[in-house]
């Protein structure tokens, strides 16, 4: 399954707010939720599937990419669900998003793909790069990033930077202090349902 590139508002109507995909929130038609819940009982499979889709859309992953992260989390010591979220949160594109430099993860991915991002003074053009404690992130094309910031986030309240990151807005420099804590992940998700979904399929 490829990465979704269609209208973002259309895709968040069912899963709800996905801050990584879009800063907008879905509207709800009067009576629509009542009809959907009362017409038929939602199966456990569908609940797990929708939670998996929420995770995939938020971080902008293909099905194959998400499955790879699930396998990696399974092979590590600790809670598979929490490790899965930490792996996704420490991606470079998500880290740039969480620093508040750009309003969405797709915008962060574009910066990385266009080679505007350096880590420890080396240009990195891989959005999935796994950021580690001690990494220093700089934006090479500072003027472009300021324009993106001014255009897309001027009317928005910038999110609080999580405790594992620091950001110097004057130098446009971010640093990774530690692995993110579960409490600082801003996506409302039940990661155990995602783990259960894959445990029944692979």
Swiss-Prot record:
Which compartment or compartments is the protein found in? Plastid
Record's keyword terms, sorted: Plastid, Ribonucleoprotein, Ribosomal protein, RNA-binding, rRNA-binding
| PROSITE patterns to which the protein is assigned, alphabetical | RIBOSOMAL_S4, S4
Region listing for Disordered, in residue ranges? 1-41
Among SUPFAM superfamilies, the record links this protein to: Alpha-L RNA-binding motif
An example Pfam family from this entry, by short name, is Ribosomal_S4
Q: Where is the composition biased (Low complexity)?
A: 29-41
Q: Where is the S4 RNA-binding domain?
A: 90-153
Q: Name one GO molecular function term.
A: rRNA binding
The Gene Ontology biological process terms listed for this entry are: ribosomal small subunit biogenesis; translation
Source domain of life is Eukaryota
The free-text function statement in the UniProt record for this protein reads: One of the primary rRNA binding proteins, it binds directly to 16S rRNA where it nucleates assembly of the body of the 30S subunit.
Quaternary structure per UniProt?
Answer: Part of the 30S ribosomal subunit. Contacts protein S5. The interaction surface between S4 and S5 is involved in control of translational fidelity.
Family statement: Belongs to the universal ribosomal protein uS4 family.
PANTHER family, alphabetized? 30S 40S RIBOSOMAL PROTEIN, SMALL RIBOSOMAL SUBUNIT PROTEIN US4M
Can you say what this protein is called? Small ribosomal subunit protein uS4c
Species this protein is from: Aneura mirabilis (Parasitic liverwort)
């Amino acid at each position: 399954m490829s990465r979704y590139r269609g209208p973002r508002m259309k895709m968040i109507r069912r899963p709800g707010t996905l801050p990584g995909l879009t800063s907008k929130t879905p509207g709800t038609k009067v009576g629509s939720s009542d009809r959907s819940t009362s017409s038929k009982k939602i199966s456990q499979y569908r609940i797990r599937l929708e939670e998996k889709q929420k995770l995939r859309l938020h971080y902008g992953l293909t099905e194959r990419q998400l499955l790879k992260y699930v396998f990696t989390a399974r092979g590590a010591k600790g809670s598979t669900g929490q490790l899965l979220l930490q792996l996704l949160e420490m991606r470079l594109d998500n880290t740039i998003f969480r620093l508040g430099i750009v309003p969405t993860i797709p915008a962060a991915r574009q910066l990385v793909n266009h080679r505007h991002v350096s880590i420890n003074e080396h240009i990195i053009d891989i959005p999935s790069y796994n950021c580690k404690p001690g990494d220093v992130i700089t934006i090479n094309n500072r003027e472009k990033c300021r324009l993106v910031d001014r255009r897309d986030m001027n009317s928005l309240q910038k999110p609080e930077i999580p405790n594992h990151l620091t950001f110097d807005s004057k130098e446009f420099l971010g640093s990774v202090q530690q692995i993110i804590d579960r409490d600082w992940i801003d996506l409302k998700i039940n990661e155990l349902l995602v783990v259960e979904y894959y445990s029944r399929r692979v």
